Amino acid sequence: MDLPGDSSPPGQPRLCRQPLTRALWGARSPKRPRLQLPGAPSPLEKASRRVLAVVLEDVMAVHMVPVVPSKQTSIPQHHSYHQDPVHRQPPASPPRQAGWSSQARPPDPLCLCREPLSRIHRTSSTLRRRSRTTPGPEEGPSQKVDRAPQPTLVVMLEDIASPRPPAEGFIDETPNFIIPAQRAEPMRIVRQPTPPPGDLEPPFQPSALPADPLESPPTAPDPALELPSTPPPSSLLRPRLSPWGLAPLFRSVRSKLESFADIFLTPNKTPQPPPPSPPMKLELKIAISEAEQSGAAEGTASVSPRPPIRQWRTQDHNTPALLPKPSLGRSYSCPDLGPPGPGTCTWPPAPPQPSRPRPRRHTVGGGEMARAPPPPRPCLRKEVFPLGGVGASPSLTTSCSSTASTSFSEPAEPRLGSTKGKEPRASKDQVLSEPETKTMGKVSRFRIRRTPARPQLNLTPMGLPRPIRLNKKEFSLEEIYTNKNYQSPTTRRTFETIFEEPRERNGTLIFTSSRKLRRAVEFRDSSLPRSRRPSRGVRAAGGRTVPPNVAPSPDVGPLLQQRLEELDALLLEEETVDREQPHWT
């Protein structure tokens, strides 16, 4: 099937175009058979390693080829891809895909196969020599602990030049190289071609692949590192990359593919059954205690702020812990409790409540019915403790270790819902002192006012208290003269008394003062009408007082009478003149 844009001759094998994203859903597609061993990585890991394979080498090929001595051939090192007319043809098998650049067009019949890197078990001493000794990006430090059952990545070099029939059924934009493979024993091999010395480029080798001297162009095969059934590294020839233009393309895309593979396509760890472990209980605490000491012996008691988990598991539960005094850790309020063996468990379970359970008041889940658990000690530290010995019960009230892990220190007063009569603790040094417990309070013990506080009525609008004035009418002389607000009257406020001390002025005795005082009142005659005071506006409008020389004299009447007579005479003259004028005309 001819793909669009395929310029290769019809007789030569074509390059199947396929995007890199097909590796993600194609690996999980039900139409494609999965060749995955029990120790093989997941399809997502294969897809991520397929992208990593594109980044690591320009034309690096990873192929899943079992080792069969009868079918494998070796090619000498000096053999070039221009001089190889005959290529081996492996049997057909389900195709495996990988991404290739859209600008890569091989001018000769060479099939470059890209398949995901994978890890296999070490089967021989030769594979152990080729196995990786340092963890790569896809192998975290957590895998160093269980190194024995983990598979190993084997990198081998082999010739990749072989003809293949044109693949059908893939119509995508990015070309993809597919080579079938089917052998007796499955074994994943990384193939890397070697270019001629004139066109040699230093390949990109991150820490994902081992720094093997075979990555550089070899000059002679190494018999100590080669299997007799696999081709020597001298037969691995790298095609010339200048007509394809792969080197500049991979240099530009390399950083993007690396970041994409590191972020999104980090392979998952091979699922393994977890080792059987005792039941663990997570405890929410605030301050993280100090780290456990690695050199602590098995039979000695812990002196750290809390007994380390190693001592909890290895220490004998029948030996009681002897603590002379509580050693406080970083929280300075948490005594050391020692291992929770049956000998040290002296805290009794919570007695049954005499009253019926009532719903909690100040909790997030307000509807839950809460019986009073054993009173928790106010030490809050984030720690992990196992649930106790062999025969310990995981319940809260019967398990000694769970009681020890949930309650660290006893408050001074019992809870409100529990009974008042509690057994005294076995060791008083493990209980907090009184000043420490008095500072600790519970929300349920805070008193809540059911009625609001009465507002004070004698406050000013600014909130200041108003002065309280007495309604008392009669005051004694002591109250008057001792009152801070009392002031003696000034000269203006002094009263004139009837009997006054006479003063002598100019040889005469003056019994009364001449100045007017406020107590001098003039009593008017009530029968006379009151004189109205003119308003200030009218007084201002008048504005001026009549001078006394312009005031009317007493002979105004005769003067007015004379003026009126003159006016009458003038009017009579005018009437007589009017009567004579029309007669003249």
UniProtKB/Swiss-Prot annotation:
Location of Phosphoserine modifications: 277
Region (Sufficient for heterochromatin association in interphase and chromatin association in anaphase): 1-135
Segments for region (Required for the interaction with GRB2 and sufficient to promote the phosphorylation of AKT and cell proliferation): 85-378
Nucleus found in the keyword field: yes
Principal location listed in the UniProt entry: nucleus
Positions of modified residues (N-acetylmethionine): 1
Pro residues: compositionally biased ranges: 193-205, 337-356
Region feature Required for nuclear lamina association, mapped onto this chain: 136-365
Keyword annotations: Acetylation, Chromosome, Myogenesis, Nucleus, Phosphoprotein
Name of the protein in its database record: Proline-rich protein 14
